[in-house]
Regions:
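Surface-exposed amphipathic alpha-helices with a cationic face
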Residues: 2, 68-77, 124-130
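Short catalytic/ligand-binding loop motif for oxyanion handling, primarily in non-cytosolic enzymes
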Residues: 17-22, 91, 120, 143-147
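Active-site-proximal loop/turn and secondary-structure-junction residues that shape catalytic pockets
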Residues: 15-17, 56, 85-89, 118, ...
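Active-site-adjacent beta->alpha loops and helix N-cap segments on the catalytic face
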Residues: 64, 118-124
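Hydrophobic faces of well-ordered beta-strands that scaffold small-molecule active sites
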Residues: 9-11, 81-83, 112-114, 135-138
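Conserved alpha/beta catalytic core and glycan-binding cleft of carbohydrate-active enzymes
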Residues: 108, 125-192
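Aromatic- and acidic-residue-enriched carbohydrate-binding clefts of CAZyme catalytic domains
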Residues: 21-76, 89-107
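Catalytic domains of carbohydrate-active enzymes, especially glycoside hydrolases
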Residues: 1-15, 37, 106
Length: 192
């Protein structure tokens, strides 16, 4: 990774999540028979054991030590480690902040990509422990968070799905993608 010039890695949900979920859980949009189950390969939308690294991703029985060694190896090579968290609907924000504190303090995670409830963005951005931690959200109100003032430390980032979609079209060479690409390229608010 270092030889490729990569300076950060974002891990999709790497905490212990339940792989077998019912199709009636909120993660699934379409209703289905209650007895039908699906494998949740990615860790999105279900309740999880947020404080533990995913044991099935580890090569040994000690997933905790292995995860810590991985983060240390990334840091030794000048690569930051960010984690994506998808908290289940209804997860209290205080609990979510405790989870982020745990991963930052125990594993020295450099940042978090938080998927789901946008209200967590404001609380996380004001949290004393996370003040210098990279925080990435899908849609947050920078003006409300910063209250019209310039941020003292620019740690908030927006995961912009529109940009992601249009940059992919542009890179593939899709016809008519240039104007959309330039629009999203220029749209970079001062707040983040």
């Amino acid at each position: 990774l270092k030889e490729l010039g990569i300076n950060a890695v974002e891990l999709m949900p790497s905490y212990e999540f339940f792989e077998w979920t019912s199709l009636t859980e909120p993660a699934y949009v379409y209703p289905a028979p209650a007895e039908e189950k699906r494998v949740n390969y990615w860790g999105y939308g279900t309740k999880a054991l947020y404080f533990a690294p995913k044991a099935s991703y580890a090569a040994s029985a000690d997933a905790v030590a292995e995860f810590a060694e991985m983060v240390d190896a990334l840091h030794e090579n000048g690569i930051e480690c960010l984690m994506e968290f998808c908290f289940a609907p209804g997860t209290p924000s205080g609990f979510a902040l405790q989870v982020l504190h745990h991963w930052q303090l125990r594993y020295q995670i450099d940042g978090f990509h938080l998927v789901g409830d946008a209200s967590l963005a404001e609380e996380a951005s004001k949290d004393a422990l996370l003040r210098k931690t990279k925080l990435i959200f899908l849609g947050f109100d920078g003006a409300r968070i910063y209250q019209g003032k310039r941020p003292w430390f620019r740690n908030l980032g927006e995961h912009n799905q529109g940009y992601q979609y249009h940059i992919r079209r542009f890179l593939k060479g899709d016809e008519g993608s240039l104007s959309d690409f330039t629009y999203y390229l220029r749209r970079s608010p001062e707040t983040h």
